[in-house]
UniProtKB/Swiss-Prot annotation:
This is Isocitrate dehydrogenase [NADP]. Catalyzes the oxidative decarboxylation of isocitrate to 2-oxoglutarate and carbon dioxide with the concomitant reduction of NADP(+). Its EC number is 1.1.1.42. Mg(2+) binds at D308. PANTHER family: ISOCITRATE DEHYDROGENASE [NADP]. Keywords: Glyoxylate bypass, Magnesium, Manganese, Metal-binding, NADP, Oxidoreductase, Tricarboxylic acid cycle. It catalyses: D-threo-isocitrate + NADP(+) = 2-oxoglutarate + CO2 + NADPH. The lineage of its organism: Archaea, Thermoproteota, Thermoprotei, Desulfurococcales, Caldococcus. It comes from Caldococcus noboribetus. One of its GO terms (molecular function) is isocitrate dehydrogenase (NADP+) activity. InterPro entries: IsoCit/isopropylmalate_DH_CS, Isocitrate_DH_NADP_dimer_prok, IsoPropMal-DH-like_dom. PROSITE patterns: IDH_IMDH.
């Protein structure tokens, strides 16, 4: 049995690898990169092991042994509670801070008062302010008529908005104080049965988030960046989010972008070659647009609540959460995690689809670490497996007439496709 660090002092990285460093705003990545991870709850151990095997195969294929991952196992969730007396031990948090490059399995937050979401706690402690949800179609069954046009990356702000948790029940002393304050100072009278919630959105947190979205768009050659907001109604929060986003983009990324208004007024409706079109959409319209005009959007940058809505809708359009990758990023630190939960009823049955965990780790290595060949190989393998109907039960039942394979068999299929892939040809596509 692996002994995990429970306290911060016990968090000692593996001697055979090296830690990534963050210097002068840039991540410095060694060739023998330490990646900290924990398996989590429920199906977590199965899908994390699957992801590790696939990612190891992709790194080995891409770099021929000149680069490798040194895995550093820590613990969280039910296992951690038994071993360390804490669902999220200080040793795990310290390991994630040290490693900077991290992979996690899903966690279960116990039902009942006094337990905050472990995922939210992790994001807050590590200041993972951008939740990144790439949404692509790999050939899986989908309700969308033209899934080939779907290539979105949703950037959801992670720390503010109504998710900040600044709220009180209607019958609390705090809510009464706020109602009294609003009445006395502003003449706003709320009935005694009114609960109170506060929606904070700040310039600094908005702009650091938008900066990450722009960097992603530039790095991946995307043609559109869209600011999603409800600023027509919430003018001083979401309206401010829109304005601060434009201000940041036009001051720091002016050479890379052209606004939609400029395209229409200066360039006859056609963007100059090599420029990213920046526009904004009202949230309710945006939720329709990704269904009706999917090819017109790439990177979508949003406040917290809107990002929650649109990312779940978007993933439903390409086959659901079994394929839904996620990446939480801050300054020089990231944690890859699937969108789905721990699904305890499927734990240990070797039937679950590990693709979301695999893709999450793929984006961690390709877009945060800077090893883009990993993405070419993993995406190729996933597409091949789906095209040949070598899939787990969730996709097999949607395809109809397909015999599902197990989690471990699916993992082996992906590894085999990676090992036999023509990387040179993939780079030329």
């Amino acid at each position: 049995m692996v002994s995990h660090p429970c306290t911060a002092d016990e968090a000692k990285p593996p001697s055979e690898g090296q830690l990534a460093r963050f210097e002068n705003g840039k991540l410095i990545v060694p060739d023998n990169l330490i990646v900290a991870y924990f398996k989590g709850d429920g199906i977590g151990p199965e899908i994390v092991e699957s992801a590790k095997k696939v990612l190891d195969a992709a790194v080995d294929k891409a770099y021929g042994g000149t680069r490798r991952i040194v895995w550093w196992e820590v613990t969280a969730g039910e296992e951690a509670q038994k071993e360390c007396g804490s669902l999220l031990p200080d040793g795990t948090l310290q390991a994630f801070k040290l490693a900077r490059v991290n992979l996690k399995g899903p966690l279960t937050t116990p039902v009942g008062g006094g337990f905050r979401s472990l995922n939210v706690t992790l994001r807050m402690v590590l200041d993972l302010y951008s939740n990144v949800r790439p949404v692509k179609w790999y050939g899986q069954p989908t309700p969308h008529c033209h899934p080939e046009n779907i290539d979105w990356v949703i950037f959801r702000e992670n720390t503010e908005d109504v998710y900040a948790g600044i709220e009180w029940p209607f019958d609390s002393p705090e809510a009464q104080k706020i109602r009294d304050f609003l009445k006395k100072e502003f003449g706003i009278e709320l009935t005694p049965d009114t609960g109170i919630g506060i929606k904070p959105i700040s310039k600094w947190r908005t702009q650091r988030h938008v900066r990450r979205a722009m960097e992603w768009a530039i790095r991946n050659g995307y043609k559109h960046v869209t600011i999603m907001h409800k600023g027509n109604i919430m003018k001083y929060t979401e309206g401010a989010f829109r304005q601060w986003a434009y201000d940041l983009i036009l001051s720091e990324f002016r050479d890379y972008v052209v606004t939609e208004e400029e395209v229409n007024t200066k360039y006859g409706g056609k963007a100059p070659e090599g420029k990213i079109i920046v526009n904004d959409r009202i949230a309710d319209n945006m939720l329709q647009q990704i269904i009706t005009r999917p090819g017109e959007y790439n990177v979508i940058v949003t406040p917290n609540l809107n990002g929650d809505y649109i990312s779940d809708e978007a993933n439903a359009l390409v086959g659901g959460i079994g394929m839904a990758a996620g990446l939480d990023m801050g300054d020089g630190i990231a944690v890859a995690e699937p969108v789905h939960g721990s699904a305890p009823k499927y734990a240990g049955k070797n039937v679950i689809n590990p693709t979301a965990e695999i893709l999450s780790g793929m984006y961690l290595l390709s877009d945060f670490v800077g090893w883009p060949e990993v993405k070419l190989l993993v995406e190729y393998a996933v597409k091949q497996a789906i095209a040949h109907k070598q899939v787990t039960y969730d996709l097999a039942r949607e395809m109809g007439g397909v015999t599902p394979i197990s989690t471990t068999e699916y993992t082996d299929v992906l590894v085999d496709y990676i090992r036999h892939a023509d990387l040179k040809a993939l780079k030329g596509q």
